[in-house]
């Protein structure tokens, strides 16, 4: 949940990942999820949140009817995941990408997992804040969040360094036998010949494979346009596309109805 100022406008946006975690004996997950959706929608409506986004549900049709009842509309989205169990991630890389990674290493690029009190973490947060400054849906505001995440056993923050400077970073979560990449940012233009984005993603994939995780899911592969450089970049690592719904609720009713008609008629 974050606020964004785009003069002369200011708005709030909330992004919810997944339907939550339930005890193994729970059978009525969709009913519980519907209560959560109603409660969070009412709360954010009072806070004048411009739009709410829900993504990465466990199945495409999970909660469909309940989300519709609460004023949400779906947009077809492409979800990408890499399998880490049948082959090593290196075997899935095309030769061109292998060469890029080799060149980056030869030129001095190194990847590491950063600690909560390290200068590398502060550099990584600064890099993400700069990288996402013109991307309203991915705004990075508070470094305290990342300091907290860096202490969690379920999260790792990777940093690609060159001459003691962080030139690429990503944030990954680990849960239920799978890995999830949340944020990815790099200085790909300033350090083009070091391929910082590629090296950062590769470092996270390699770590997840070495730790025995089955899949790496990319939580945001970009907007669902026919030509999407971010999606093509991620697919280059040997991943697969799976269609899913991403749900939205817009505070202004007529805009929400128009968007629903535009994407679903």
Task: Walk through the language-model features, giving the residues of each.
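A conserved beta-strand-loop-helix scaffold within acyl/acetyltransferase catalytic domains
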Residues: 1-5, 56-193, 223
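Divalent metal-dependent hydrolysis catalytic cores, especially in the metallo-beta-lactamase
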Residues: 48-56
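Aromatic (often tryptophan-rich) hydrophobic motifs at membrane interfaces
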Residues: 2-3, 11, 22-26, 34-42, ...
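Short secondary-structure transition/capping segments
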Residues: 64-66, 123-127, 228-231, 254-258
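Membrane-proximal basic amphipathic "stem/tether" segments
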Residues: 248-265
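Short, polar/flexible loop-turn hinges at active-site or ligand-entry regions and domain interfaces
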Residues: 23-30, 87-92
């Amino acid at each position: 949940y974050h606020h964004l100022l785009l003069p002369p406008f200011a708005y709030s946006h909330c992004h919810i990942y997944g339907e939550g975690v339930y005890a193994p004996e729970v059978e009525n997950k969709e009913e519980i999820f519907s209560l959560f959706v109603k409660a969070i929608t009412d709360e954010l409506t009072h806070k004048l949140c411009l739009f709410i986004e829900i993504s990465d549900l466990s199945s495409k049709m999970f909660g469909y009817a309940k989300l519709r009842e609460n004023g949400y509309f779906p947009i077809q989205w492409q979800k990408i995941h890499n399998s880490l169990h049948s082959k090593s991630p290196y075997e899935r890389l095309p030769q061109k990408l292998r060469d890029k990674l080799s060149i980056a290493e030869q030129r001095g690029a190194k990847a590491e997992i950063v600690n909560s009190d390290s200068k590398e973490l502060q550099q990584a947060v600064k890099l993400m804040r700069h990288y996402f400054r013109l991307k309203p849906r991915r705004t990075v505001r508070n470094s305290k969040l990342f300091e907290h995440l860096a202490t969690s056993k379920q999260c790792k923050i990777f940093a690609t360094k060159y001459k003691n400077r962080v030139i690429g970073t990503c944030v990954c979560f680990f849960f239920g036998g799978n890995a999830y990449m949340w944020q990815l940012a790099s200085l790909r233009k300033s350090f083009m010949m070091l391929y910082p984005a590629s090296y950062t993603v590769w470092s996270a994939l390699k770590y997840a494979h070495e730790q025995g995780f089955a899949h790496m899911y990319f939580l945001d592969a970009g907007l669902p346009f026919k030509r999407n450089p971010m999606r093509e970049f991620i697919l280059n690592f040997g991943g697969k596309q799976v269609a899913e719904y991403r749900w939205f609720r817009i505070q202004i009713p007529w805009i929400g109805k128009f968007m629903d008609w535009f994407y679903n008629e």
